[in-house]
């Protein structure tokens, strides 16, 4: 794999890519605390990553990712994989006030569908309340293994694993 080109501009994307309905249903059940067959869940995630990577390659995307297939969303990702954050369900999500004010019609629809009814997990603000430590070693290992396996059967210039930006939390 090469990570640059002098012939053309390489393409990639950021953010989640659509997940299959069966994966969404399993994620919603997991977030709700319903009992799950862990092997079935992991197999569905592995298949979703493989399909997501295949579609990116077929579309002509050069720099591939797992499309965040294993993550219900980065709002829950922080609580699942980092220590030092606490949920504040009584607080309103601050969001991006300047951008929201600049594009109110878009964000009205976005918050209603993507962040509300369309979200896998309820959006609950989290606040840093202590030292930050990583605790998601097994989950990130699984994500990397799934991505490596998926990429092994397609042509890609490069690959990356998405993660939340530090600015995504307070």
Residue ranges and their predicted role:
Residues 1-170:
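Domain-level signal for soluble alpha/beta catalytic cores
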């Amino acid at each position: 794999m090469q990570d640059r080109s002098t012939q053309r501009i390489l393409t990639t994307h950021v953010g989640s890519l659509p997940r299959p309905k069966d994966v969404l249903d399993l994620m919603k059940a997991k977030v709700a605390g319903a009992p799950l067959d862990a092997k079935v869940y992991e197999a569905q995630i592995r298949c979703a990553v493989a399909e997501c990577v295949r579609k990116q390659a077929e579309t002509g995307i050069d720099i591939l990712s797992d499309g965040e297939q294993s993550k219900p969303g980065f709002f829950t990702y922080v609580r699942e994989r980092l220590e030092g954050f606490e949920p504040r369900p009584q607080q309103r999500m601050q969001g991006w006030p300047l951008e929201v004010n600049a594009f109110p019609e878009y964000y009205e629809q976005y918050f209603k569908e993507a962040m509300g009814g369309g979200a896998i997990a309820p959006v609950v603000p989290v606040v840093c309340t202590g030292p930050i430590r990583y605790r998601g070693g097994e989950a990130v290992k699984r994500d990397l293994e799934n991505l490596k396996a998926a990429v092994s059967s397609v042509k890609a210039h490069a690959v990356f694993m998405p993660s939340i930006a530090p600015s995504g939390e307070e």
